Amino acid sequence: MKMKTRKNLKVLLFLLPILLFAVVFVYYPFVRNIVNSFSLVNAKGEIRGFAGLENYRYTYGRKDFPQALKHTLLIAAINVPATLIITISLALLANKRRRLSPLYETLFTMPMSVSMSAACMIFKSMFSPSVGIINYVFGLNLGWFESKETALAACLILTIWMGIGFDFLLMLSALRGIPSHIIEATRVDGISPLRRIFRVQIPLISPTIFYVFCTNFVLAMMTSAPMIIIMGVSAESSATNTLMSMMYQSGFSSSDYGLAAVLSITAFVLTLGFTILSFVFERKRVHYQ
């Protein structure tokens, strides 16, 4: 019994650092955020009283909230399928041409080596109305980030590009994990390459696709960096306002911690609801070997 107690104590000691980290930086902020959403919080972050549902009524009644929610859901609806289609296509290309695979891996994982702030500055220069290469190639004269009509599309392109590298590696690893005898059997049976992709390879890598699908949705819901770094608080920033960028501006620019807490709780509930639905869908469409 003493040996078992000592063993459990050793395990607890090894787990203690990560448990402390989780409590201090994950669980406490999460609980405090819930408390703030129902409280009157001053500019110093001090709770001054109980607000009930007043913060929620105020947040959901703001004119900019529906637009921020719409932009957040739109980014998720476009970003997730676009990233999946692009990364699966690139992985299939790299997996097919093994001799050029090292070159493809270097090129397609390049976004991983660029920080978000640097990528924002690069894309802002590329989409510049005066010196941008995008306007030069297509013969346009658009201020992509300066126009309310195109700012969100430009931010979307940036977020998709930033997410390609890591997801490409996951898809490529999954494809290379398919047993070679299965692929050989499809060739012997005379199955066309296109049918092999949709009937054999994609079903076999469906667990990886499901993982990328869920994580990309969460990341898309949390998208705020391009909107904050590039758009800032300009007049055009409303065209790219999301729940997270609105939360950032409320918490760090306006010190309205009650509003920021409600926005973060809203994003959390939406993400949690989608995740639950995804796992229900997983039982029917995801095939584990």
Describe the predicted segments one by one.
Residues 4-289:
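A structural signal for multi-pass alpha-helical bundles of membrane permease subunits
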